[in-house]
């Protein structure tokens, strides 16, 4: 808003609401908007025999292994994984490790969704 002033005849609460709404829409149209997705800090504890399968699962284009340790005779893998990639992971982990691995996660941060995925999301929302 530039050079705004109140005038007893021309100014009203509704006029200011409309002007504010128009300014917000214009700013949103000019802004570079991105879609963000949650990244989860994942920790998998597994027997040594299944380490290769676990690492294979946690590697990928939107997954990042942060650290690998040994704790109480088991291997521990810490990774960052998108929340979308975590859905269904517990079942996959159990089947690949015969139920011997454990898994925990907590929110870590947000990251920008890759452009090719963002375009699909926008197209899907616009189609509704």
Curated annotation (Swiss-Prot):
The function of this protein is: Catalyzes the GTP-dependent ribosomal translocation step during translation elongation. During this step, the ribosome changes from the pre-translocational (PRE) to the post-translocational (POST) state as the newly formed A-site-bound peptidyl-tRNA and P-site-bound deacylated tRNA move to the P and E sites, respectively. Catalyzes the coordinated movement of the two tRNA molecules, the mRNA and conformational changes in the ribosome.
Task: Name one cellular component (GO) term.
Answer: cytoplasm
Respond yes or no to whether keyword Lipid metabolism is given for this record: no
- The keyword Protein biosynthesis is annotated on this UniProt entry: yes
Supply the source organism for this entry.
Answer: Planobispora rosea
Q: Which UniProt keywords apply?
A: Cytoplasm, Elongation factor, GTP-binding, Nucleotide-binding, Protein biosynthesis
Any GO MF annotation of the entry: GTP binding
Compartments (UniProt record): Cytoplasm
Task: Identify the domain of life.
Answer: Bacteria
Pfam families linked: EFG_C, EFG_IV
The UniProt entry, under InterPro entries, shows:
EFG_III/V (IPR035647), EFG_V (IPR035649), EFG_V-like (IPR000640), Ribosomal_Su5_D2-typ_SF (IPR020568), Ribsml_uS5_D2-typ_fold_subgr (IPR014721), Transl_elong_EFG/EF2_IV (IPR005517)
* Location, primary (coarse class): cytoplasm
- Gene Ontology biological process terms, A to Z: ribosome disassembly
State the similarity comment. Answer: Belongs to the GTP-binding elongation factor family. EF-G/EF-2 subfamily.
- Protein name per its UniProtKB record: Elongation factor G
Q: Which SUPFAM superfamilies match?
A: EF-G C-terminal domain-like, Ribosomal protein S5 domain 2-like
């Amino acid at each position: 808003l530039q050079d705004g002033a109140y005038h007893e005849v021309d100014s009203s609460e509704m006029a200011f609401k409309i002007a504010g709404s128009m300014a917000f829409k214009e700013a949103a149209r000019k802004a570079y908007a991105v879609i963000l997705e949650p990244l989860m800090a994942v920790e998998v504890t597994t027997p040594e025999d299944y380490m290769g399968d676990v690492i294979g699962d946690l590697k990928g284009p939107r997954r990042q292994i942060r650290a690998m340790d040994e704790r109480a005779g088991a291997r521990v893998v810490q990774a960052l994984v998108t929340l979308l990639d975590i859905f269904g992971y517990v079942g996959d982990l159990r089947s690949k490790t015969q139920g011997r691995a454990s898994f925990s996660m907590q929110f870590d941060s947000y990251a920008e969704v890759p452009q090719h995925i963002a375009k699909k999301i926008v197209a899907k929302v616009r189609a509704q």
